[in-house]
């Protein structure tokens, strides 16, 4: 049995692996709950477009609207 000493306490290998797996899978869920985007992006929030033609600009704006 492997025992690791961290900050003066002893932990077994399975305890460390469960802690790592828990932080990997639960951490992003907690982060997404805490830092949720409150309002959708508006047209002002879109960076300036460097389209070469009006059609290209319309295509980009349509794509952004569909994939919000």
UniProtKB/Swiss-Prot annotation:
InterPro entries reported for this sequence: ATP19
Membrane topology: Single-pass membrane protein
Subcellular location: Mitochondrion inner membrane
Keyword Cell cycle tagged: no
TM annotation in the entry: 13-35
Family per similarity comment: Belongs to the ATP19 family.
This protein's name: ATP synthase subunit K, mitochondrial
Gene: atp19
């Amino acid at each position: 049995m492997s025992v690791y000493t961290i900050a003066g306490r002893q932990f077994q290998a399975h305890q460390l692996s469960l802690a790592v797996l828990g932080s990997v899978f639960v951490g992003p869920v907690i982060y997404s709950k805490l830092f949720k985007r409150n309002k959708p992006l508006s047209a002002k929030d879109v960076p300036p477009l460097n389209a070469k033609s009006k059609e290209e600009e319309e295509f980009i704006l349509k794509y952004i609207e569909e994939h919000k």
